[in-house]
Amino acid sequence: NEEAEKHPDVKFAMMFNQRTNPLYQKVKEILDAGTIGNLRRVSWIITSWWRTQKYYDSSAWRATWAGEGGGVLVNQAPHQLDLLQWLCGMPSLMEAHLKYGSHRNITVEDDVTAYFEYPNGATGTFITCTHDALGTDRLEIHGDNGKIIITDSKSVVVKKMDKPEDVWNHELDFRQM
């Protein structure tokens, strides 16, 4: 931007502070240790940042391209998107459906459903919005040997299988489940 060009000696950096959150550091350790095996699917529904029309109307810069540069993806969700990449790696494909001003009188996105694929074939979804008054925050990371479930960015449950899924696939009959 123009202001940065005026001061080339000044360093600019961005910090994604959620990487320092002990909860997510523990999840990263679990993933890096291979506890749940190879990534198969990740799904994050993060709709817990409800905003009213009065919120958007309170300042001219809110929910505008000129003021914020975007909507929910830029203002509320960048930390979660960073965590997804940090925890699960960089997707090789990403597609998204965005709705602009779908539930509020704004010009930027307020409802997003994204789908992505990873180099190993794993898939993922990321759903976010600012119009869910009850809100949800649930991240599931599914591997071929277990699953991590994070609820409300506060609690972590690790479910581990005694054998990898592909072994169960060959050994068990569906009636044994």
Enumerate the language-model features and the residues they cover:
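Beta-strand scaffold of nucleotide-dependent catalytic cores
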Residues: 39-43, 125-128, 150-152
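Glycine-rich GHKL/ HATPase_c ATP-binding element in histidine kinases
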Residues: 122
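Generic preference for hydrophobic
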Residues: 94-96, 126, 141
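C-terminal glycine/acidic-rich active-site capping loop/insertion
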Residues: 113, 118, 138-177
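A short, glycine/Asx- and small/polar-enriched loop/turn
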Residues: 107-111
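Predominantly a Rossmann-like dinucleotide-binding segment in NAD(P)-dependent oxidoreductases
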Residues: 9-13, 18-105
